[in-house]
């Protein structure tokens, strides 16, 4: 069966505000763009910034659509095991964090995993870039983006889609930070 008809050249989510994508003002600006002006002072964090948290992720996984929730749930389960068994600092669940607390946590994070969900690209990818954390993500070798943001072992660290090398990747990068 030929699936070429399903392919399309499109813009990706990274071309919109990824610094405060879920803020109230950003939501309003999307609804009434001609009334609320857009001025964003993005504060980037250097990757060399001292970081105390080995692994951190916050994501929803209790979703109605298993096709969206599966990869998130599987990643969270495996991360919890890896964090516990390797005595790493970090968390995959916890109380809701304010935007300020969340950004502070991202700035303190060494490895920011990013599961697939609604698609391959996610807000978390850009949060890692902005806050200088190492982006750990399923291999994106199958996808070409513009701008080319997914360059293996340069802009992100890939792991196998079946998670078979996840523990090894995390262990290696924690030991060789």
Protein language model annotation of sequence segments:
Residues 157-177:
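C-terminal "capping" alpha-helix adjacent to the active site of nucleotide-linked donor transferases
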Residues 1-123, 134-152:
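Nucleotide-sugar donor-binding catalytic core of glycosyltransferases
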Residues 129-130:
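Short alpha-helix at the nucleotide-sugar/activated-sugar donor binding site of glycosyltransferases
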């Amino acid at each position: 069966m030929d699936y070429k008809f399903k392919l399309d050249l499109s813009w990706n989510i990274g071309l919109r505000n990824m610094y405060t994508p879920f803020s109230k003002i950003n939501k309003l600006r999307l609804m009434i763009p001609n009334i609320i002006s857009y001025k964003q002072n993005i504060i980037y964090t250097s990757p060399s910034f001292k970081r105390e948290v080995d692994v951190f992720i916050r994501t929803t996984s209790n979703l109605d659509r298993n096709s969206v929730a599966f990869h998130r749930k599987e990643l969270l389960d495996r991360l919890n095991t890896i964090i516990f068994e390797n005595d790493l600092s970090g968390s995959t669940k916890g109380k809701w964090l304010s935007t300020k607390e969340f950004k502070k946590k991202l700035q303190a994070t060494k490895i920011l995993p990013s599961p697939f969900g609604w698609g391959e690209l996610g807000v978390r990818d850009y949060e890692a870039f902005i806050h200088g954390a190492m982006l750990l993500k399923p291999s994106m070798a199958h996808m070409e983006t513009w701008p080319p943001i997914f360059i293996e072992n340069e802009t992100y660290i890939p792991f196998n889609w079946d998670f078979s090398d996840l523990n090894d990747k995390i262990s290696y990068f924690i030991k060789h930070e």
